[in-house]
Amino acid sequence: RLILCKKSILVEGDSDELVVQRAYMDTHEGRLPIQDGIDVMTVGGVTFKRYLEIAQTLNKETAVVTDNDGNIESVKKKYKEYEEIQCIHICVDEVVDTGDLKLSDKDFNYNTLEPKILKENGREAMNNIFGTNYSTDDEMHKYMRTHKTDCAIAIFESATKIKYPEYIMRAIKNE
C-alpha cells in the first residue's frame, strides 16, 4: 500500500484511522483520502519506523500521526533521525495535558486522541455525537476510553463536523 499510494498517513490504531479519515473528508469536500491517492494506514506504534525506512527509500510523502503520551521529548527522540527528511512529517501534539482522573489507581493519560478531541470540542458536543448525557468531563473521558472504536465510528458517521487536534490537521494538510 505504501508503494502504491501518492502519500501515506500512518496512525497508531483503528480509532485514529477513522478520525483522520473524517478530518480529511471535512476539509476536502467530503472526499475520502484514498480518492486523492492518500492511504491512511494503521501500523501500530512499534512498526512506524519500518514504514518510515521504506518511505524514505521511496521518497514517499508520509505523515506520522502519534500521541505524545505525556512525553514529547520521548517522541522527538524516537523520530530524531527523520527530522531532516523532507518527505517525512512527524505530527504530534506539542502540549502535555494533565488532570486528576484516576482509572484503577493509575493516572489517566490525557495525551491520547480521545482526550484531545474532548478538549477541542467540549462535553456537550461529544454528548450530542455519542448520544450520551455525561455531566462531567471525567465521565466522558471514561466513556471515550472504554468505547474507543464506538466513539470513532460515531465521529466518522456523524452529520455534525467536529474540531480536530492541530497535529491531525497538520498531517492532512501537509500535501
Model-inferred region functions:
Residues R1-E175:
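Acidic, divalent-metal-binding catalytic cores of TOPRIM
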